[in-house]
């Protein structure tokens, strides 16, 4: 008798042709909503169209349909990203001085944009060195291209075309997986399989293939470039991949192939998989051999992580079990029910992912300057400042987005009847304690951090420098930060005996790396000035968290409005006849949180910009004397509010204000224009709906008089629309002003 194991049941995970492709449908504005599809009666229609076009929850209640729309939209997003990348590479191929920069990256500035003199604006094409005139770019693409082994503009062309092909492929995939073969809900909820593919596939194999590229292509090409070989003489990437002898000339252990791997004699590979620490003195970037080693290690970790969860084979972790086992003696039911929340609410899922990605983006901002990963990045001060600022802003927006979607989850997806005594329920039940304590912390930090500055301004104004908090009078040294710095500076000799230097030169230890007479990085001293501004950071971050967390915890109900959940995510007030209930919706908390996020990030990027110009960036003489851009004035000037205004904002804005008539004049115009956009926002934030409705009605009267009245009735913006337009212009104007101020300054002095 033959006993067979039962045949595995094949689950059909897609529906065929669920939604027909219809261009007529797409051409009808608002086809996703009965009300909007009727067309406009009033001008509010266009606002509703924009507000609801991507709010898939408002189109349908069917979770499967919502999931498919989100999934399909992701392919569209990827298509746009590939298109953008293709454009970047195309500019590098067609309009840039990449090959010239590659031959002399210390004296030639990167440029990939040449202004066409259509209206006589050719003055913007500044001399970036090497006889090339164009706009200096600060995105870091040149440094990435060099690190990845791109040596010619032809290679950039090919990559640009490849990215276009991928963009088309993604567009097709988005259409295919919604209209032709749409996944079933069960597929979206199969978290273990998803973890398997995302961890082992995307992150594991992705890192492994990148490590392979770095070892076989980037390392040899960069070795030649560092030695001063003409890029045209360097073998092409495929020659290194196909011809092992070429690599063996640079790294002799390559001649032995995979033998050392299988005989566990891994130290043979230490030539190109290193653990040195510190920066390469030739390029001022991390050792590329360290980076290759890192990606190999990360790949192994993620390949293992991706195989820990139970998929088709009945072994491994079950995520639901892990979450339900996760409870301590004081946490009631713990994470019971969290699995159901995260598999049925995309908003809950998104909130967690945005919070983590936002935090990670801010971590990236801090590592890009302290451990500059690409060759010649550290000495390109404009790019360093831009990368820090960019990643800080993005991180701030993502974290506010996390709070927004957490609140939407609370309003739309949270079911209080099934949740009892789990962690979320317990947090909600003592939300008053959380918010009131957080409020106390904010008041304490605000008064004390600001108070230290006010004290210093007062003493300075009264001519009593000996009574100020400063490194030369009453010291407030950041002793914990200094302790962390020293621990890390001493680490290589203690915890990592194989490493020749610490993870970052910023920790201390006296090393300085300079490339082409410019400082790449050196130990960053921390003193009283940093202690003061650090507490301003603590204050602004805590206030942002207070506003956002209050919005989430009180999204469904509060003492003021017990039935808030019925009013939805955004509403202006709790109806007529209930005074004092405006600006309480979860949306309004996001709105207010954005302003404090803007405050918080502004102080961070100002601190960074001035600190680096004062204590890190500068030139080094043949005798080894470092001259910093602002001559080390941060420690004594930034300890008063007046100092920030006088020696940072005013002194450093001279470049942007005096840029007219030079190649930086576009930044001068942007500086002016962005101030205007910012001021324009105040018109929306400080005036009410009724004011505008009155004005509109008298304008409509005039149109009627002349018989030119439109069929669509004009309406004033609703309260929420006005605030949305206001905060958008406030942030756009503020960020663009900062951008123009930073870049004009750093391009002229850096």
UniProtKB/Swiss-Prot annotation:
Phylloquinone binds at residue 692. The keyword Metal-binding applies. Its EC number is 1.97.1.12. P700 is a chlorophyll a/chlorophyll a' dimer, A0 is one or more chlorophyll a, A1 is one or both phylloquinones and FX is a shared 4Fe-4S iron-sulfur center. Pfam families: PsaA_PsaB (PF00223). Keywords: 4Fe-4S, Chlorophyll, Chloroplast, Chromophore, Electron transport, Iron, Iron-sulfur, Magnesium, Membrane, Metal-binding, Oxidoreductase, Photosynthesis, Photosystem I, Plastid, Thylakoid, Transmembrane, Transmembrane helix, Transport. The keyword Acetylation does not apply. It is an enzyme of class 1 (oxidoreductase). Chlorophyll a' binds at residue 675. Chlorophyll a binds at residues 683, 691. It catalyses: reduced [plastocyanin] + hnu + oxidized [2Fe-2S]-[ferredoxin] = oxidized [plastocyanin] + reduced [2Fe-2S]-[ferredoxin]. GO terms for biological process: photosynthesis. One of its GO terms (cellular component) is chloroplast thylakoid membrane. [4Fe-4S] cluster binds at residues 573, 582. It is a multi-pass membrane protein. The chain crosses the membrane at residues 70-93, 156-179, 195-219, 291-309, 346-369, 385-411, 433-455, 531-549, 589-610, 664-686, 724-744. PROSITE patterns: PHOTOSYSTEM_I_PSAAB (PS00419). It is found in: Plastid, Chloroplast thylakoid membrane. The PsaA/B heterodimer binds the P700 chlorophyll special pair and subsequent electron acceptors. PSI consists of a core antenna complex that captures photons, and an electron transfer chain that converts photonic excitation into a charge separation. The eukaryotic PSI reaction center is composed of at least 11 subunits. Belongs to the PsaA/PsaB family. PsaA and PsaB bind P700, the primary electron donor of photosystem I (PSI), as well as the electron acceptors A0, A1 and FX. PSI is a plastocyanin-ferredoxin oxidoreductase, converting photonic excitation into a charge separation, which transfers an electron from the donor P700 chlorophyll pair to the spectroscopically characterized acceptors A0, A1, FX, FA and FB in turn. Oxidized P700 is reduced on the lumenal side of the thylakoid membrane by plastocyanin. NCBIfam families: psaA. This is Photosystem I P700 chlorophyll a apoprotein A1. The gene is psaA.
